[in-house]
Amino acid sequence: TTDFRPRQFDLIVFDWDGTLYDSTALIVRCIQAACADLGLPVPSRTDSAYVIGLGLHDALAHVAPTLDKARVPELGLRYRHHYFQRQHELSLFEGTLEMLAALRARHHWLAVATGKSRQGLNEALEHVALRGVFDATRTADETASKPHPLMLQELMAEFGVEPERTLMIGDTTHDLQL
């Protein structure tokens, strides 16, 4: 049967990590390993998970508040080392492909707004064969990172969609603050 109900939203924007991509546990372990590599106090799972969705620099500065700000990029390199060694283990949450196909069939614009880097998102999209599924994406190294609303505002402007016709779907308070 065909669904003729009017759409409530034209643009649906997804967070990536922890929303579509089952990556939370790996990100937490990589943050903890990076801190250990530099001899820093290892943040708890809760503290490590809390920063997911922020840009990497902001996230690492938050979990390692005693680290000299000039050394945050070094911590980022250690995080990336651990993450890129294991990212091949990650996958989409069950039902994600079917949900995206159903939304596409209803003619929604689909987008991603993430705290990941452009390289990280592109590699993840390639890994799960979703490279051409989204109409637009924004990453933390291209625009203001969450919780700043700029990436969401840019996506709405790109499609000419008003906020009341836009739905942001995420898994953290950083996503809700957009």
Q: Whereabouts are the PLM-identified features?
A:
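Structural signature of beta-strand start/N-cap positions in the alpha/beta core
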Residues: 10, 101-102, 109, 135, ...
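Helix-loop "lid/cap" segments that line or gate small-molecule binding pockets
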Residues: 34-35, 55-69, 124, 155-156
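Conserved SAM-binding loop
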Residues: 13, 20, 92, 110, ...
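Metal-dependent phosphoesterase signature
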Residues: 61-98
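Short, acidic loop-to-helix structural element flanking the phosphoryl-transfer center
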Residues: 84-112, 118-122, 149, 153
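Substrate-recognition "cap/lid" segment bordering the active-site pocket of phosphatases
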Residues: 89, 117-169, 173-178
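Hydrophobic alpha-helical segments typical of transmembrane helices
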Residues: 8, 30, 44-47, 55, ...
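Active-site neighborhood of HAD-like aspartate-dependent phosphohydrolases
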Residues: 2-50, 64-69
